[in-house]
């Protein structure tokens, strides 16, 4: 009986460590800077149907800033499609 209890405890510890590792790995990947893109004023970063995605200018602006080439972005609805366009290019020295 003690062996079964010990095995269950080891499985629980392993699963706990695995979950912690996956969470920390996901957080560190989320903080990593994305690949820089060349700056084209008004570039469309993404276009998604509103059935799956609502137009969020805050999310769009964050996505544009994370590319490293823009200072802002706006989300607009065109023909029932949410379109994120990036604006205000950064000067790359």
Swiss-Prot record:
Record's protein name: Putative defensin-like protein 190
GO biological process: defense response to fungus; killing of cells of another organism
Main subcellular location: secreted
Protein family membership: Belongs to the DEFL family.
Localization per Swiss-Prot or TrEMBL: Secreted
Lineage start: Eukaryota, Viridiplantae, Streptophyta, Embryophyta, Tracheophyta
S-S pairs: 39-89, 55-75, 60-84, 64-86
GO CC annotation terms, alphabetical: extracellular region
Leader sequence residues: 1-30
Assigned keywords, A-Z: Antimicrobial, Disulfide bond, Fungicide, Plant defense, Secreted, Signal
Origin species: Arabidopsis thaliana (Mouse-ear cress)
């Amino acid at each position: 009986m003690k062996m079964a209890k010990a095995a269950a405890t080891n499985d629980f510890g392993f699963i706990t460590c695995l979950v912690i590792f996956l969470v920390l790995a996901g957080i560190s990947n989320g903080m990593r800077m994305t690949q820089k893109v060349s700056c084209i004023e008004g570039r469309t970063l993404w276009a998604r149907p509103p059935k799956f995605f609502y137009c969020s200018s805050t999310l769009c602006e964050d996505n544009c800033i994370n590319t490293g080439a823009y200072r802002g972005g706006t989300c607009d609805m065109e023909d029932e499609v949410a379109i994120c366009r990036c604006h205000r290019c950064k000067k790359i020295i």
